[in-house]
Amino acid sequence: MAAAVKVVQEAPLPAALDSKMHKVSIIVQLAKFEALKKALNNIGVTGMTVTQVMGCGLQKGSGEKYRGAEVDATLLPKVKVEVVVSKIPVEKIIDTATKALYTGHIGDGKIFVYNVAKVVKVRTGEQDYNALQDVE
């Protein structure tokens, strides 16, 4: 099995391509989801998409317990939380999620940040920044 490729340098997004809207995907253990949801709500995140997923990372192949039983650690149940933000700084989302999830052990989770090119609120036709605002 080949070793993971180590990232040596972050490639900055050219300013012309940065829409100021970002999707943050957070992969988290089931047991940590409620703490993450509460922490995100406390900083003003009002909407999120939550999906139950299966995945593995560095803990692959190690013994894991799920609901008290030893399970095959090839794929473990996780939760993927996705938020799209424009008003709340991405770094605040990352910092909040990291503090809510950190245990110092393998399996604490991963955070992925993507630039969002376009958002359309279907009901109103609002686009981009306006589509992300919670006003009626």
What residue ranges belong to the model's regions?
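Positively charged, small/polar-rich N-terminal and surface patches that mediate targeting and assembly
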Residues: 1-136
